[in-house]
Amino acid sequence: MAEQKKIRVTLVKSLIGTIESHRACARGLGLRRREHTVEVLDTSENRGMINKISYLLKVES
């Protein structure tokens, strides 16, 4: 079975002052603090969360 693709996501801006739903998306992606980097699976759900808070993130494939 082929390995699923992953996306590396880094939180580059603080969550202070953002909308609660945007903070929930960051938590859903596993991001806890500024400059925190995680690798998430390349699924439509994760891509939707990344798209919603793209102004806070740096994304690498």
From Swiss-Prot:
Gene3D superfamilies: Ribosomal protein L30, ferredoxin-like fold domain (3.30.1390.20). Keywords: Ribonucleoprotein, Ribosomal protein. One of its GO terms (biological process) is translation. Pfam families: Ribosomal_L30 (PF00327). GO terms for cellular component: cytosolic large ribosomal subunit. It comes from the Bacteria. SUPFAM superfamilies: Ribosomal protein L30p/L7e. GO terms for molecular function: structural constituent of ribosome. The keyword Ribonucleoprotein applies. Part of the 50S ribosomal subunit. PANTHER family: LARGE RIBOSOMAL SUBUNIT PROTEIN UL30M, MITOCHONDRIAL RIBOSOMAL PROTEIN L30. Belongs to the universal ribosomal protein uL30 family. This is Large ribosomal subunit protein uL30.
